[in-house]
Amino acid sequence: MPPSSGAEVYLGIDVGSVTTKLAALDEEDRLIDSLYLRTQGKPIAMVQQGLREMANRLPAGAGMRGVGTTGSARYLAGVMVSADVIKNEITSQAVAAVHFVPDVQTVIEIGGQDSKIIMIRDGIVTDFGMNTVCAAGTGSFLDQQAQRLNIRIEDLGQMALQSQRPVRIAGRCTVFAESDMIHKQQSGHRIEDIVYGLCLALARNYLNNVGLGKEILPPVLFQGGVAFNRGMVRAFEEILNTKVIVPRHHEVMGAIGAALLAHEEMAVRGNGTRFKGFEVAEADFGTSSFECKACPSLCEIAQVFLDGKVLARWGGRCDIWERV
């Protein structure tokens, strides 16, 4: 239900390597609208596009009360919009999960190029794991395999559900998985059995790596873009022998979490938002990086400019470059 004119809005922005998500909540933390965009290697342009689209979707007079950013480019997005809160993906995903399923104990989150597992007890994060090195099981790998099999990524999950005799696929490495799939095709196995075999392999790989040593207890939530794939949901349910819940807005949970955190921050702070306004969608931002030689660490420092002026720097082990 769209907010009425004059409604208070909290905006969350989640900028990842593959997708950029925005979510707008009302003062009662109900989702007003959301956006799911491909980052395409252009995080600044996608944040600006998202802001333009969101500005057009919100009714005239809706007041922005707080903005939060998260994701791998959270600092960049936060500087661009002057965010009120900048939080890591673990916190944002967990906050959104607890908001929708208060008794959640395990969150499986698989994005475009990384994956996470979050253990929650009594609404508090007690442990987590991340995999940002290997692409096996991520959305980008599934995209590649769908293209190779000449299947639309949207149809991959439905095809996996048709499998009755899934084949065993080596899922520890993307290279081995792909070669194994080719071998199974050449051996005459049905495509749906290969596809679901891949889903099972990727789910096992996730649990044996990201979930290694973790106590996975229900309720289990599956968040992130890969949760669109019903074959992956089926695979996790089969391996874990428990129901896996896919939240209605699973693909934008990070952005929802950032908006919830912004609402919480503004309630504590009590003053106005730092948000620069939707006009930043037309601003001329630029970025660059350099290697700091102040000590043997040789940190790579990222910096963002607006009209040639440095707005912020980050990435060092100390704060020598953060004092702009």
Kindly give the residue locations of the regions a language model identified.
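Gly/Thr-rich phosphate-binding beta-strand-loop-beta motif of the actin/hexokinase/Hsp70
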Residues: 2-28, 104-121, 165, 291-295, ...
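Glycine-rich phosphate-binding loop plus the immediately following alpha-helix
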Residues: 40-44, 122-165, 173, 264, ...
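Adenine-nucleotide phosphate-binding core of ATP-dependent small-molecule kinases
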Residues: 177-208
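Glycine-rich phosphate-binding loops at beta-strand->alpha-helix junctions
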Residues: 71-73, 212-239, 250-254
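Glycine-rich phosphate-binding/hydrolytic loop that grips phosphoryl groups
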Residues: 95, 142-143, 248-278
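Conserved phosphate-binding/catalytic loops in two-lobed NTP-binding clefts
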Residues: 84-90, 237-256
